[in-house]
Amino acid sequence: MMTAANTHAIGSLDANGQKATLRKWLLFGLAVVTSCAWHVFPVSAEEPAKEPAKEPAKEAVVTDSTKKDCRYEGIGEKSNGGASGMELFPENDLFRPLWADPKQPQQFMSVHATQVRGPQRSHFNMWSVGFGDNFGLVGKRNGCNGWQVGILPAVFAQFDLDSGSTDLINADYVVGIPVSFRSGLFSGRVRLFHQSSHLGDEFILNNPGVTRVGLSYEVLEAILSLDAPGGWGRVYAGGATAIHVTPSDIDPNSVHWGFELRGPTMAAPLLAKPMPGTRLTPVFGSDFQAFEELNWTINTNVIGGLEWSKVGSDRRLRLLVSYYHGYSPYGQFFGTKLEMVGGGVYVSF
């Protein structure tokens, strides 16, 4: 039987139990709320700081840094940065070489069926080779406008293919100082050069009737050129005078003119796919010269063919056929009338 004291004790226990139970539920609820808050609102101080999201890597932008050969491309263009300072050993030239001129310093090998015109007509096959170029020493440019001074070494040699040992017939040696300039579509070249000519020893031995001439001269020449917009063609004209000639009785003056045409440039068939950037351009030109010593008779060279080049390169290779009619352009035979038909490989740097 329960006593009053027991009843009071049980009541006290119930009250205490209820308080303890309530306290447990409060602690449990606090733990749940704290746990939820921990996951929903994480404490930044205890969580490692996240790195800022990185932007996706951008692909490298390939810019067209292809340089332009001012002899053929970018004619008359100005630089966005304005005029540059003096430049040592400038690349290529501002004046396009007169590649239809038989005596243009360049690298070539050609074969010609040659007819000597005159009372005693004769025919032979000639191999003609040339080595030379315009090497820029110093210049100043604003894009493709400006001026340049260089040095000009060259040799031109002709061989008799019908002889048993391919005898050297004649060799012309040239060295000079060219000054070239360009302003828009106008360009020009002034040259002071020396040329000496020599017969081949085998040719003299096999032709005892031939007399060697000690031919040499120093010439001052000037040529002006006007390009068509876009560089598809040009005309040029000028003249020269010999300031010293051996033999001294040779008349000194000459005139020189011509034109060039360039067809549309296209991807080179068969080559553009395995070698990207290879281009093909049809080319044609005619060069005319007349000399006071030869009574101003017009000497004509007509030449044309195909030119291969590469984007961003100064190098060009041409396969050309040609027809020449007039006095010989080769020193020791300058008074001999020739007619030549042939073709060859021409390389430009």
What residue ranges belong to the model's regions?
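Cleavable N-terminal export/targeting peptides
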Residues: 1-81
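Transmembrane beta-barrel domains of Gram-negative outer membranes and organellar outer membranes
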Residues: 55, 59-180
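Outer-membrane pore/translocation modules
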Residues: 69, 144-261, 325, 334-337
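Predominantly the C-terminal beta-signal and adjacent terminal strand-loop region
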Residues: 86-101, 295-349
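Short loop/turn motifs that connect adjacent beta-strands in outer-membrane beta-barrel proteins
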Residues: 95-103, 136-149, 227-234, 263-282, ...
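Transmembrane beta-barrel strands of outer-membrane/channel proteins
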Residues: 109-113, 151-155, 190-194, 237-241, ...
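Solvent-exposed loop/turn segments connecting transmembrane beta-strands
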Residues: 120-126, 163-165, 244-253, 289-300, ...
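Residues on the lipid-exposed face of transmembrane beta-strands in outer-membrane beta-barrel proteins
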Residues: 131-137, 177-183, 222-226, 257-263, ...
